[in-house]
Every structure is written in C-alpha cells, then in structure tokens.
Amino acid sequence: MGSVTAVLVIDLQVGVLEGCFDVEGVVARVGVLVSRARREGVPVVWVQHEEADMLHGSAGWQLMPELVPKPGEAMVRKTCCDAFVGTPLRGVLDGLGARRLVLAGAQSDYCIRATAHRAVGEGYSIVLASDAHTAASTAFGDVSISGEQIVAHLNRSIGGLARPDVAVELAAHDAVGF
C-alpha cells in the first residue's frame, strides 16, 4: 500500500492574499483540489498564519470565504513561514499516517517554499500544485519581481529539493494524483 497523502492548504487568508497574483483563480483551483481530495477520502489540513497585524480571529486572519474547512479537518496555527516550526503539524500528519503532502496556498516565496523545504528535510514526499499557489510582486533594489514570476520560479526550482528517498512532484491542481 502506498503512503497516505494529505493536502496542506497554507495561508489562504484575506490578509495574506492582499496584492497577490491571480487570487481569484488560485482560490478557485484550491477549492477544486480540496473538493477532489475530500471525494477521494484524502485528508485536508488547513494552515493559518498569525502575527501582530493579523491576529487570530481578525478580519485579515480569516480564510477566504470560498474556502470552508469541514468539521474534523485539522487546523494548524503558525507564527512563522515554516508550518512545522512551533506547531503541531508533525503530530497531525503522523496521526493521519501522511508521508506525502500536496502543497497549495500562499505565499510562494515564503510559507510555501519554507514548508516545502522543511517537509522534504523531514522525509515527506511533496507535490506542489503548480497553479494553486500565489505570491505578491516585490522588489529588491532596482529589480522588480512580479508575483507571476515568483510562482513560475518556485515551479521551476522545486524539483531541486528531490532526494533519492523522497519524491518531489509538480502537478496542476486537477492533475494531482492521490
């Protein structure tokens, strides 16, 4: 029998998504991914970021209204980019028997990337839902980087995390295999 897969929906919150690339499309595609997972009995884990300007329960902390966790789905609160640091995520995944994680959400260059790196380092195989993560445009010095470019860069580079004992995959939301 293959390893159990879990879908991690990371930080698709009102405050996190302000100014991000293709928010409406990403939220819709994550909704489809979550619906597919539920139909196939794949657990969904919801991760929400909180910090001083986005406190637990505040308007910005709320998940996008199109995305509603079902009773019994795990909710994990975090305070830094890596969803494993200072959270019960590892225990939640162990309790589910999950060894393969499908990652979707925001922001590509922060919480998605950090969680992907940690997951692989911890021995989880990962699938990045290539069209179901997003980022905001940014700049470094005189160089501007669009949210679309950040998404494309993570899609392009994620395979570099692979190791002999851990699979790293890239798949569109509607092509992720469970």
Language-model-derived ranges and their functions:
Residues 13-19:
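Short acidic, Gly/Ser-rich segments with clustered Asp/Glu that frequently serve as metal-coordination loops
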Residues 2-6, 28, 32-40, 52-178:
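Active-site-adjacent betaalpha module
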Residues 21-24, 30:
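N-terminal beta1-alpha1-beta2 module of alpha/beta enzyme domains
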Residues 43:
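Conserved beta/loop motifs at nucleotide-recognition and modification sites
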Residues 8-12:
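N-terminal nucleotide-binding beta1-loop-alpha1 segment
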Residues 20, 51:
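Second-shell loop/turn segments in exported
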